Amino acid sequence: MAKEIEKPVIIHSRDAAEDTIQILRDFRKENPQIENPGVIHCYSYSPELAKEYVAMGFYIGIGGVVTFKNAKKLVETVAQIPLERILVETDSPYLCPEPNRGKRNDSSQIRYVIDRIADIRGIAPEEVEKQTEMNARKMYRLS
């Protein structure tokens, strides 16, 4: 449907890494002309898999989980993929970032995600804000 109406897809893959990547590999082979095909929402797999998604043109959605102490793979992913392919997300009402973990998540919590990405990458939060806003505008085809 997204292809027919020329909109990006939002992929939420949970415990289905191999199935998801294979479906998207096949899709990209058949549709190489589609720019910015979508986002892998609430990303939770390896940095290597993220790099493959990025190579296919997808954005990687990073939410509150990146602030959790046990999010080692996600921290590695954020450090290794281009900032130009990251979208920040809330996953509201779930997965509220530290220091509010366990509470209801909403868009006011996005600051913690931005700050954590900036910390991981050793850059200013304003740089993360600016780039991820540009990424969202490009991915969602907003002017």
Task: Please name every model-derived segment.
Residues I23, P97-E98, M139:
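Residues that scaffold the ATP/ADP-binding catalytic core of kinase and kinase-like folds
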Residues I60, Y94, K138:
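Active-site micro-motifs of SAM-dependent methyltransferase domains
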Residues M1-L87:
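Catalytic pocket-lining loop regions of alpha/beta-barrel enzymes
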Residues T67, K103-I110:
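Short amphipathic alpha-helix initiation/capping segments at coil-to-helix junctions
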Residues E84-D106:
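Short acidic/histidine-rich active-site segments
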Residues K7, R14, R85, R101-R104, ...:
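Basic side chains
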Residues K29-I34, G102, G122, E126-E127:
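Short, glycine- and charge-enriched coil/turn segments that flank and shape catalytic ligand pockets
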